[in-house]
Each structure stands twice: as structure tokens, then as C-alpha cells.
A protein has these predicted regions:
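Jelly-roll (double-stranded beta-helix
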Residues: 1-30, 41-52, 57, 62-151
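Short amphipathic
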Residues: 32-36
């Protein structure tokens, strides 16, 4: 279980996440993080959250966001939200580091899922196929699903 101040490193997504407020801190109501993406991070698989809404504020750099097939670039000081059920992908396609405030409501087990992804990436496991196609649909069905949104 994640703790306030804990940092995760996902070598595959080129992402570092620091937990500000965890599910345990908020009785499951929210998860708050600061996420930093290294330059030229790979585009992740599109997915959606059936029961969660995400909020982002770009502190530094820029993020590329694909929602329902449309791509938008958000820059420092800009904010955006992703409603539950919206198919999306978020990554740093730019040549500079991106730093973002990221909030997920409700938290559910998102922090645990992020911890597992980070551990798998550090072990050099092919996270995309193994994790998103086999483990995610079963263990984290309430948190994340791949494919088309249905909500």
C-alpha cells in the first residue's frame, strides 16, 4: 500500500510518481500525486476508468492527451479533466520533462496498480502485453479497462 511521500519509478513509461494523498489518507475518496514524465515517453495503450474521474494541472513542460481519438497538447499552467468512461491516453511526447499534478476520484486501488506497474517495469517485464491484457482486466477491473468506453 502506498504512503504519502512515497515515490515510484516506471522505467517503461518514463514516469516518476510521488504520492501526496493516498487512498488510506482519504478513506478511499481520492488519490493525489505529482507525476514527472521524462522527454519522449512512449504513447501508452488507450484505456478508460469506469468509475473514476481524473484531474490534471501541468506544472512544467507539456502533456499529450488523446481522448476519443482527438489529440490535444496541454502546457504549463493548463488544467484538464478526464471523465469516467472516456477512452484516453496521457504521455509526454515533447523533448522536455513534464511535471503534472494528478488527482483521481475516488482512489479505489489505483495506487496499488501503479506500484505493480512500476515494479514490473523495473524487472524488465513487457508490461504492455502482460499487464494490460492479462492482469488489468481481471484484478483492476474497477480502476482501468482497455478498449472502448461503455459508460
Amino acid at each position: 500500500m502506498a504512503t504519502k511521500g512515497q515515490t515510484l519509478v516506471n522505467t517503461r513509461s518514463k514516469q516518476v510518481i510521488e504520492f501526496l494523498t493516498t487512498s488510506g489518507d482519504s478513506n478511499g475518496n481520492l488519490l493525489e500525486m505529482v507525476s514527472s514524465w521524462q522527454p519522449n515517453a512512449p504513447e501508452p495503450s488507450e484505456h478508460y476508468h469506469p468509475f473514476q474521474k481524473e484531474y490534471f494541472k501541468v506544472y512544467e513542460g507539456e502533456l499529450t492527451v488523446k481522448q476519443n481519438g482527438e489529440t490535444t497538447i496541454y502546457r504549463a499552467t493548463e488544467m484538464f479533466e478526464i471523465d469516467k468512461g472516456i477512452v484516453h491516453a496521457v504521455w509526454n511526447a515533447s523533448g522536455k520533462t513534464a511535471k503534472v499534478y494528478w488527482k483521481v476520484k475516488p482512489a479505489l486501488r489505483t495506487e496499488n496498480m501503479l506500484e505493480i506497474r512500476a515494479k514490473l517495469s523495473q524487472k524488465g517485464m513487457f508490461v504492455t502485453k502482460f499487464f494490460t491484457r492479462l492482469l488489468l482486466p481481471i484484478k483492476y477491473r474497477k480502476e482501468l479497462r482497455t478498449g472502448k468506453g461503455s459508460f
